[in-house]
């Protein structure tokens, strides 16, 4: 079911949001003029905002836009309603639409994954396949600063290293981009409200069996109330610093990696143990991770 929010929004909201996203696109070289961008859209507020924001910026960059929606089939009728909403949105905006329905539960069972991870893998495979088959060279997703803060906290709780603590990458090697990464979720809601735009709500976002939802609804509010009202901004700042440093280190690891590779064919990759032993343990970890 779609929801329309109504608040008193400042007339500058749209311009400010577009300015932030435009700057993000340029800072991270997310798009080049004439790119074909496939937007992953669930129907929720973040992805709906992504569609309208990129559509507003498309003329400046000569972008060819399309929408991709995966029906996970996890919420029965609600999943079908989400698909219907996204279909209507694409028709209204006259954008090409690519839709698929997958059995995420079966994928989860066969690979012994959590539901959340199984859904993510199936969704990304669908996006990458749809982009490749239909001529789109970029895939845009609606992750924002709150998502990034949650990701950093999840990585911290898992005991991740610097790469995990670097959060959600604004740009991935497989051409996935996140134009909204410098915006708060509340800012996206303001943007939708200002333009009186509909979206759907996913009830699973309130299910506290998922760690991310616990972090969003319990841990972050506690951190904001008791320790740092701007903890989301602080976590994003830490992630940005680590992301930049990781990239710098990775660039310098590459020549060592190329020296260490002794076997590289479509099904196998081998590293020289003797060459690895010449490097400190931190470099060894990075080299092995790069090979994987």
What is the predicted role of each segment?
Residues 1-2, 277:
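Generic N-terminal leader/processing signal
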Residues 210-292:
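ATP/NTP-dependent adenylation/nucleotidyl-transfer catalytic domains that generate, transfer
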Residues 2-41, 45-221:
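Core alpha/beta nucleotide-donor-binding catalytic domains of modification enzymes
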């Amino acid at each position: 079911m779609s929801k329309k929010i109504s608040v008193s929004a400042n007339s500058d909201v749209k311009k400010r949001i577009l300015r932030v996203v435009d700057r993000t696109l340029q800072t991270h070289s997310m798009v080049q003029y004439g790119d074909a961008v496939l937007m992953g859209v669930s129907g929720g507020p973040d992805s709906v905002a992504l569609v309208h924001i990129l559509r507003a910026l498309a003329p400046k960059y000569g972008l060819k836009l399309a929408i991709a929606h995966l029906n996970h089939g996890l919420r029965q009728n609600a999943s079908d309603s989400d698909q219907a909403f996204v279909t209507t949105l694409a028709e209204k905006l006259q954008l090409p639409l690519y839709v698929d329905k997958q059995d995420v539960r079966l994928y989860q069972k066969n690979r012994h994954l959590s539901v959340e991870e199984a859904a993510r893998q199936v969704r990304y495979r669908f996006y990458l396949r749809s982009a490749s088959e239909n001529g789109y060279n970029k895939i845009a997703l609606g992750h924002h600063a709150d998502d990034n803060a949650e990701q950093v906290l999840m990585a911290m709780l898992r005991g991740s290293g610097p790469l995990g603590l670097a959060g959600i990458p604004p740009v991935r090697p497989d051409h996935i981009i996140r134009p909204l990464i410098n915006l708060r979720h509340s800012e996206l809601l303001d943007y939708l409200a200002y333009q009186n735009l509909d979206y759907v709500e996913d009830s699973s976002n309130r299910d506290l069996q998922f760690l991310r939802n616990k972090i969003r609804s319990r841990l972050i509010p506690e951190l904001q109330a008791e320790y740092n009202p701007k903890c989301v901004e602080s976590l994003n700042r830490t992630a940005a610093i680590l992301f930049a440093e990781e990239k710098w280190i990775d660039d310098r690891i590459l020549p060592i990696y190329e020296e260490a590779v002794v076997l590289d064919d479509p099904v196998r990759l081998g590293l020289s143990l003797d060459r690895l032993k010449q490097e400190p343990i931190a470099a060894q970890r990075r080299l092995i991770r790069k090979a994987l």
